[in-house]
Amino acid sequence: MQRAWILLTLGLMACVSAETRAELTSDKDMYLDSSSIEEASGLYPIDDDDYSSASGSGAYEDKGSPDLTTSQLIPRISLTSAAPEVETMTLKTQSITPTQTESPEETDKKEFEISEAEEKQDPAVKSTDVYTEKHSDNLFKRTEVLAAVIAGGVIGFLFAIFLILLLVYRMRKKDEGSYDLGERKPSSAAYQKAPTKEFYA
């Protein structure tokens, strides 16, 4: 019984020490260049210079072409649910105009103004990403792990109580002398001595 308590104590100490070690580590330990996730190698800033630069004189542009419009259905996703469900659909029209010769700064300003106007109109539509719950790095801060540990502890505690009660019951029975099951030991006369003649070939 003492061994069981020692093992239980050692197990709890190992869990607590693992929890403190997990809290001490940070995300900077995972990268070689000792910088945060945002500054880690492999993540480069977005270069928008190539988007607006083009070659050609632009003499062959068709200025009389009509504006093309496309419609796109964007689902509204509730951010509170764990599973994405499409509630309503909104119709968003986007006009595509032929390319015009403007400076990149003017084009960027217009796009920025359009995106701000869209955000003011309907902020719920601005993100179509599926909402996912971020799991914490520490194992014991997750609710499912914590529930499993508590359930395991309760079951182990009940099993320990059962073993203690069984031990007490057997000790009381032993004191009463009820372990005599009625089997008699055979007497020494029941065993006959075999002849000790040895034959040599």
Curated annotation (Swiss-Prot):
Composition-biased stretches (Basic and acidic residues): 106-123
Topological domains, Extracellular: 19-144
Keyword terms, alphabetized: Differentiation, Glycoprotein, Heparan sulfate, Membrane, Neurogenesis, Phosphoprotein, Proteoglycan, Signal, Transmembrane, Transmembrane helix
UniProt entry tagged with the keyword Transcription: no
InterPro entries: Neurexin-like, Syndecan, Syndecan/Neurexin_dom, Syndecan_CS
Site keyed Cleavage of ectodomain: positions: R142, T143
TM regions (residue ranges): 145-169
Segments for region (Disordered): 42-69, 88-129, 178-201
Organism superkingdom: Eukaryota
One GO term (biological process): response to caffeine
All ranges on the Cytoplasmic side of the membrane: 170-201
PROSITE patterns named among the record's database cross-references: SYNDECAN (PS00964)
One function term, GO molecular function aspect: PDZ domain binding
Family named by the database record: Belongs to the syndecan proteoglycan family.
Function noted in UniProt: Cell surface proteoglycan which regulates dendritic arbor morphogenesis.
Protein name per Swiss-Prot or TrEMBL: Syndecan-2
Higher taxonomy: Eukaryota, Metazoa, Chordata, Craniata, Vertebrata
